[in-house]
């Protein structure tokens, strides 16, 4: 994980310029925000990075408090939102049952221990809380994988 963190810290200044896919998926994930019947007081954007999804969450839920969480300090510095916490997703700095809504865009594939990650998310979520995320699966970008296999 430390190598991933180092890479994100180094890339943060120019990340938005080359993150077309991340932004596109955040747009699609944000479309779900408009049909969710939840009135959250506190939202975590887990793996918020520079804030692609953060901005959309604030627009969808303007009365909520948004907390941007990322383990790459430099990415958080590029994020314009006020409440930012540099933290490990496996050890979120919140009490049990304290968060109404967690959103996360393309962060989970960087976490080798998904069980620990999900356990931690559900620990901080209120019983009626919601976790909305996007991630890559085994068939994601299969055309690109196939192309690389021909080159290799």
What are these model-predicted stretches?
Residues 42-92, 101, 116:
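Class I SAM-dependent methyltransferase SAM/SAH-binding core
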Residues 1-14, 23:
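N-terminal, positively charged/glycine-rich alpha-helical extensions of SAM-dependent methyltransferases
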Residues 115-130:
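A short glycine-rich, Lys/Arg-flanked "PGG" loop and its adjoining helix->strand segment in the class I
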Residues 20-40, 56:
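Conserved alpha-helix/loop element of class I SAM-dependent methyltransferases that forms part
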Residues 100-115:
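A short SAM/SAH-binding and catalytic strip from SAM-dependent methyltransferases
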Residues 130-152:
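Conserved class I S-adenosyl-L-methionine
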């Amino acid at each position: 994980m430390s190598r991933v963190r180092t890479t994100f810290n180094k890339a943060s200044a120019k990340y938005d310029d080359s993150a077309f896919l991340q932004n596109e998926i955040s747009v699609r994930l944000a479309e779900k925000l408009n049909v969710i019947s939840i009135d959250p007081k506190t939202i975590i954007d887990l793996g918020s990075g520079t804030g692609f999804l953060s901005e959309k969450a604030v627009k969808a839920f303007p009365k909520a408090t948004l907390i941007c969480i990322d383990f790459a300090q430099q990415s958080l510095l590029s994020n314009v939102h006020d409440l930012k916490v540099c933290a490990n997703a496996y050890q979120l700095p919140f009490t049990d049952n304290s968060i109404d809504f967690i959103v996360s865009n393309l962060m989970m594939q960087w976490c080798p221990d998904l069980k620990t990650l999900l356990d931690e998310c559900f620990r901080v979520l209120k019983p009626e809380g919601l976790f909305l995320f996007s991630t890559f699966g085994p068939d994601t970008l299969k055309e690109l994988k196939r192309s690389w296999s021909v080159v290799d």
